[in-house]
Amino acid sequence: MTEFWLISAPGDKTCQQTWDKMNMATAESNNLSTNNKFNIPELKVGTLDVLVGLSDELAKLDTFVESVVKKIAQYMTDVLEDSRDKVQENLLANGVDLVTYITRFQWDMAKYPIKQSLKSISEIMSKQVTQIDNDLKARASAYNSLKGSLQSLERKNVGSLLTRSLADIVKKEDFVLDSEYLTTLLVIVSKTNYPEWQKTYETLSEMVVPRSTKLLFEDQESGLFSVTLFTKAIDDFKQQARENKFMVRDFLYNEEEMKADKEEMTRLSTDKKKQFGPLVRWLKVNFSETFIAWIHIKALRVFTESVLRYGLPVNFQAMLLQPNKKNVKKLREVLKDLYKHLDSSAAVIDGSVDIPGLNLSQQEYYPYVYYKIDVNLLELK
């Protein structure tokens, strides 16, 4: 399971006793979950008013940062295109996989100095992730524009002979050029009509050059034929061709234009390759930064809610549980039995009641502090 439960309970005589009791009830006795202590340093508490306000702000920040983490992960998938099997190896936090990072979580003192107030630390995180989100939008927009232009040109090289680019199909020698009297037309003929075309093309107009047709290219359904005729017979030929279910494609051979299209495709393809490496590196680095910020926000939320629930002095144990998939319901029941004494109203709580300062949706209200962390960021099954 990629789901973790980050919970806290007040210290008994010691926080170690709280840990031992929970671990014995869930992991050692019943194998309901895999557990780790979640280390939160001694943070500055501040006033109760500040904590209540901060609880609301952290809930919003948590949602925002999680959305940025998922956006970066999803965009990494989009950018890697044909190498999607390599996505997970690029989604790391501090160089380790996400499960390892969470289960061995250590507060980053350099990024988020604990001498600062809780509000200041949350503002550092908010500013950092907002900047990453803005950078992501700008980089994604530039890369997507480049990718879109390239795909648009590539689409011209596939599809129907009526619409696709002919730059890689026709050559200069396929046409009569710079003639005052003669011109070359391109005609699309379905494969079933090849015999009919060969039999009739010379008679579709009075001024068709005999034996001038040539098959230049064919796809699964049709062939592209050239035919040479007098310029003044073009309109008559087109009309007769249409009546015989032969499609004349409007095409003017322009070497410079076709060369420019090829050069543009080469340029776009080169630019995309040049941007690919730096973009993947940026995504990798900033995924790590954002994920780390997200888990620190979870730590801040646990700290704030624990103080609001359990009071001062600060005395609680934060614990990370990874539920065994088949035992989720049983685990919840064991935790309820373990901690129901913390909140006598928990058993009869009204789903419509809003509990000030706790900022938990009612379907996730428990007598202990609880937050879910799901590291299945790409929603892979």
Swiss-Prot record:
Keyword vocabulary terms for this entry: Acetylation, Hydrogen ion transport, Ion transport, Transport
Modified residues (N-acetylthreonine): T2
Domain of life: Eukaryota
Any one GO MF annotation of this record: proton-transporting ATPase activity, rotational mechanism
SUPFAM superfamilies: Vacuolar ATP synthase subunit C
Function: Subunit of the V1 complex of vacuolar(H+)-ATPase (V-ATPase), a multisubunit enzyme composed of a peripheral complex (V1) that hydrolyzes ATP and a membrane integral complex (V0) that translocates protons. V-ATPase is responsible for acidifying and maintaining the pH of intracellular compartments and in some cell types, is targeted to the plasma membrane, where it is responsible for acidifying the extracellular environment. Subunit C is necessary for the assembly of the catalytic sector of the enzyme and is likely to have a specific function in its catalytic activity.
Name of the protein in question: V-type proton ATPase subunit C 1-B
Organism this protein belongs to: Danio rerio
Gene name, Swiss-Prot/TrEMBL: atp6v1c1b
